[in-house]
Amino acid sequence: FGRGRVVSYSPSGAVEVRAAGRAFLDMRARIERQIEQRTLMLSGVSHDMRTPLTRLRLGLSMLDHEDRSELERDVADLQRLLDDFLDFARGEAASGQPEQTDPHALAAKAVAEAQRDGCSLMLAPPSGTGLVALRPLSIHRALTNLIGNALRYGTHCEVSVVISKRALCLRVEDDGPGIPEDQREQALKPFVRLDPARNQDRGSGVGLGLAIAADIARSHGGTLRLGHSDRLGGLCADIVIAR
């Protein structure tokens, strides 16, 4: 359950063991119910907020181009912020069960999408082979967040995948200012933006990109580690998941 896997379980054995098992099942049910209710509520909020945003876009389309360009960027920023809030609140509730997945293919897809947008990044040669139990959509989201974060604060980034017998490591490195060691734990918390190296002026957002990636890593029984990139000199972000 801690790794995001719902396994059928029926308490058995001694009285104390059965009591502990039933208490765990009750706890799991309460957690699942809370996640479902939160997701439904925020999905409704998201829908209600998208309607006025659509009206704003329609109204802006009637203005002259030179008058509406900055306003359209503001509306687009609001849309991205809304999507980030919803993704963070949704967590893993709608992402399905883990399936045997090729991590190299996932990384290649995320890199190709960023390259199509004109971003400067590359995928390192693969290290190791094999399938890993992952939620593909969630891991793709985590990689996209890390790549977007890297390119927001740097000019170039590199993505690499290492598969060993015991673990999977998805790494994103950049040539930006990095994050001081004493601030890395803080950087993984939601709604945290660090100053002055990584501040609001560097791009839109509310500090959810790393938090969402860390949440996805934890839901797979893994972790998101932040460090210094010896190769590029900036931040090194590792998603490490046990196999």
Predicted segments, located by residue:
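HAMP signal relay modules and closely related sensory coiled-coil linkers
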Residues: 4-7, 11-26
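Short beta-strand/loop element within the Bergerat-fold HATPase_c
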Residues: 156-166
